[in-house]
Design a protein with these regions (language model features):
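DUTPase catalytic domain/fold
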Residues: 1-164
Length: 164
């Protein structure tokens, strides 16, 4: 069986540029996911609210070339999961859709829908409540900031944009 891994490309918007370079430098291969940072202060009361992360991302699945002895690899776009971090319980928040399944063609800003279990919760800029996880819990070996991401037919269409 050949080793498969993932590469995460991050297009950071102005409001999140300070967090992600530091997170990339300090990440550990022992982590199951890549932590995301809130890019705005958000107050959550009675209705669900979207927490923005200030980034657009692309996850690539990387596989060694089949039947080859070379170091060449095949890279393909991959779906990924947006999951709450275990520490989210301290915030009084609950992810409204339990797990976010992000299509490989999505090119909009990442956001997480949350409910307040207390009826009055807040999120501050820089809070880490969510993470990107590879679909098979695979290793996100490389994370890098990029200046652009390739366009897709879907583009930035967000929640519910591909059907009811």
């Amino acid at each position: 069986m050949t080793a498969v891994w993932y590469e995460l490309e991050i297009l950071s918007h102005n409001d999140a540029q300070t967090f992600y370079p530091i997170a990339i430098m300090n990440r550990s291969d022992a982590n199951a996911g890549f932590d995301l940072f809130s890019s705005e202060n958000v107050q959550i009361e009675q209705t669900p609210v979207l927490i923005p992360f200030g980034i657009t991302v692309r996850l690539l699945k990387v596989e060694p070339m089949p039947h080859g002895m070379s170091n060449e690899v095949v890279k393909t776009d991959s779906h990924f999961l947006l999951m709450p971090r275990s520490s989210i319980y301290k915030s009084g928040l609950l992810m409204a859709n339990s797990t976010g399944v992000i299509d490989k063609s999505y090119r909009g800003e990442l956001k997480a829908p949350v409910w307040s279990m207390t009826g009055n919760s807040s999120v501050q800029v820089g809070d880490r409540l969510f993470q990107i996880v590879a679909p098979d819990m695979g290793w996100i070996r490389h994370v890098r900031l990029v200046d652009s991401l390739p366009d897709t037919e879907r583009g930035a269409g967000g929640f519910g944009s591909t059907g009811k």
